[in-house]
Amino acid sequence: MADITDKTAEQLENLNIQDDQKQAATGSESQSVENSSASLYVGDLEPSVSEAHLYDIFSPIGSVSSIRVCRDAITKTSLGYAYVNFNDHEAGRKAIEQLNYTPIKGRLCRIMWSQRDPSLRKKGSGNIFIKNLHPDIDNKALYDTFSVFGDILSSKIATDENGKSKGFGFVHFEEEGAAKEAIDALNGMLLNGQEIYVAPHLSRKERDSQLEETKAHYTNLYVKNINSETTDEQFQELFAKFGPIVSASLEKDADGKLKGFGFVNYEKHEDAVKAVEALNDSELNGEKLYVGRAQKKNERMHVLKKQYEAYRLEKMAKYQGVNLFVKNLDDSVDDEKLEEEFAPYGTITSAKVMRTENGKSKGFGFVCFSTPEEATKAITEKNQQIVAGKPLYVAIAQRKDVRRSQLAQQIQARNQMRYQQATAAAAAAAAGMPGQFMPPMFYGVMPPRGVPFNGPNPQQMNPMGGMPKNGMPPQFRNGPVYGVPPQGGFPRNANDNNQFYQQKQRQALGEQLYKKVSAKTSNEEAAGKITGMILDLPPQEVFPLLESDELFEQHYKEASAAYESFKKEQEQQTEQA
């Protein structure tokens, strides 16, 4: 990408590039060429793309009135999309034609008309669904294929967390007639050697209604648990007694052997119902048959998911408040020892120490009581109690998704605190407060260069920000080291003294943790966030992590998963905007 010239920078000063805290200019000018301005949504942007880069790209198309790259309110990092507003609709149309899916800093951008009215974005008319897409079909190929039928408001291939196509996508036309033409022309067409399915997009409510209609009038049956000795004649004869049959077939493999299931299609729904009622759980050649309504794969998956969710909720309710998580266990503690330690506090339904494939203790386990009261009593009595030379950590067990959600909230809270501290520090510096300025503490990350750990005398600041000359954090092999007091002097009273040593302890722990975390990831931002999350634990829980690689690995994985979950939520917010 060409560098921004002085002339471009000068032009940018005359633009109404809005403040990050304000909303982008509104408008849904795609609905009519009579509108005097046009607002475009520009998505899939590389994080470093700025308003200046976008101006350099879009200004040759026409007169740009404003540009805004949307950013996180706390971290100020790009959310991956922007709004570009032109002074006339024709310039916006040309920008879509000429720049849509062109690379910006190595990424293909996605441009569409900005739809500020939610009712226009969510309307069903003109929106179509495409499935069975070849993995090589990307957003540009999808757009190019369907744009010949009319103006497209948006198009998108659904992708997984790794950016790979899920095999389906959506195209939203401005006009409903264009959508109908596309369906008529492309449904069943071969695209990259695969026959695609194109149909109007249905909302979940409409799909559920359609499914209920199918259930109420089904004629096709699925039969399983069929004995391998069963013949086609036996199978058809068994079902023919309930009414006229359109077809009956037993599924076979390439060698002609039965797969153990088949299908029967009746002429009338009533006959199919009779067959299900009479033959389900009946025996044929010594095997108990299953006979039920035939379902499509996606419907079966939906049913299985609902069953699993019901089971999961039932299990959650059953163990709510009674299942305890116990960590920092000595390697000598086994299931029996764990149960013995907690037995005095109530009836234990299970006690388990988690182990590796080789049978080695992972240093944590679970104890399940019969009532919440017993579990609460055990937490009160056993948490921080020494067992086999180690202080136990005992708490109510939480699901992974709950822990990840909590850790993600901690990330957001920490980002907000850091932003507020930096803002307050800048304000204090601007006010010229002599001798009292303390640099903001950046917990969970290495301090920025030029900012020392301890309170400064500005003329004595270490330019390496509290780091030794070799640039590596100091090593502490035997726990935290309480160093020299800050340059502002010793603590004046007992309370200040306690706070001072707590700060030094946290600093020492953070330095050691950061070293272990940074050895696991090359992403500096992730290393800082993960270190901060682990450092939020009480010090007595952090110390064991420095000694036990297995305990550290467990906490690192949880914090890393929470960080990734947080990043995905940001990306989803970007897509929904």
Curated annotation (Swiss-Prot):
The keyword Cytoplasm applies. There is a cross-link at residues 7, 337 (Glycyl lysine isopeptide (Lys-Gly) (interchain with G-Cter in ubiquitin)). Disulfide bonds: none annotated. SUPFAM superfamilies: PABC (PABP) domain, RNA-binding domain, RBD. Changing residue 148 to A: In PAB1-148; greatly reduces poly(A)-dependent translation and moderately reduces stimulation of cap-dependent translation in vitro. Changing residue 263 to V: In PAB1-7. In PAB1-15; fails to bind RNA. Residues 489-568 form the PABC domain. A motif (Nuclear export signal) lies at residues 12-17. GO terms for cellular component: cytoplasm; cytoplasmic stress granule; cytosol; intracellular membraneless organelle; nucleus; ribonucleoprotein complex; ribosome. RNA recognition motifs (RRMs) 1 and 2 bind specifically to the poly(A) tail, whereas RRMs 3 and 4 bind non-specifically to polypyrimidine RNAs and may serve to bind to a different part of the messenger or to other RNAs. RRM 2 also mediates interaction with eIF-4G. Binds to poly(A) mRNA to form a periodic structure with a packing density of one molecule per 25 adenylate residues. Interacts with the nuclear export factor CRM1 and with the importin SXM1. Interacts with RNA15, a component of the cleavage factor IA (CFIA) complex. Interacts with translation initiation factor eIF4G (TIF4631 or TIF4632) and release factor eRF3 (SUP35). Interacts with the PAB-dependent poly(A)-nuclease (PAN) complex regulatory subunit PAN3. Interacts with ARF1, DCP1, PBP1, the Hsp70 chaperone SSA1, and TPA1. Interacts with PAT1 in an RNA-dependent manner. This is Polyadenylate-binding protein, cytoplasmic and nuclear. The lineage of its organism: Eukaryota, Fungi, Dikarya, Ascomycota, Saccharomycotina. The gene is PAB1.
